[in-house]
Amino acid sequence: MFSTSDQVSKMNSRILSALLILGIATCVIAGGFCPKSRHPQCNLSYKINDCCAQSDCRVGSVCCVEGCGNVCRAESDTPLGEKFVDGSECKHGHVFPKKWYQFW
């Protein structure tokens, strides 16, 4: 037969396992926020995209939309900037605006 201490031990290990899984899931989902944009306005006639997905950035960084293109920035605790949405239209590198004759 099981003693009361064995039952308590099993219950404690289940609770700790559940808390561990919850903690890991929270870290994976949290993702972080973009800090305030350094350059909200861009004086260039083109953009330079360093990232086109969150996976393009290192751990602890987030792909953020800036005035002159998307860049990887260190995560912030507060949502002050604009985070790039995975799946949005994006092209890596220098992106020039279309000329009038390229729209057709």
UniProtKB/Swiss-Prot annotation:
Would I find rRNA-binding among this entry's keywords? no
Under InterPro entries, the record lists:
Elafin-like_sf
Instruction: Kindly list the GO CC terms recorded for this protein.
Output: extracellular region
Write the signal peptide boundaries: 1-30
Annotated disulfide bonds: 34-64, 42-68, 51-63, 52-90, 57-72
How this protein is processed and modified after translation, per its record? Contains 5 disulfide bonds.
Location of this chain's protein in the cell: Secreted
Q: Give the WAP domain ranges.
A: 31-76
Q: What does this protein do?
A: Has antibacterial activity.
What name goes with this protein?
A: U20-lycotoxin-Ls1a
Note the SUPFAM superfamilies from the entry.
Elafin-like
Is Disulfide bond one of the keywords UniProt gives this record? yes
Keywords, A to Z?
Antibiotic, Antimicrobial, Disulfide bond, Secreted, Signal, Toxin
Family per UniProt?
Belongs to the venom protein 11 family. 02 (wap-2) subfamily.
For biological process, the GO terms are: defense response to bacterium
- Organs and tissues of expression: Expressed by the venom gland.
* One MF term in the entry's GO annotations: toxin activity
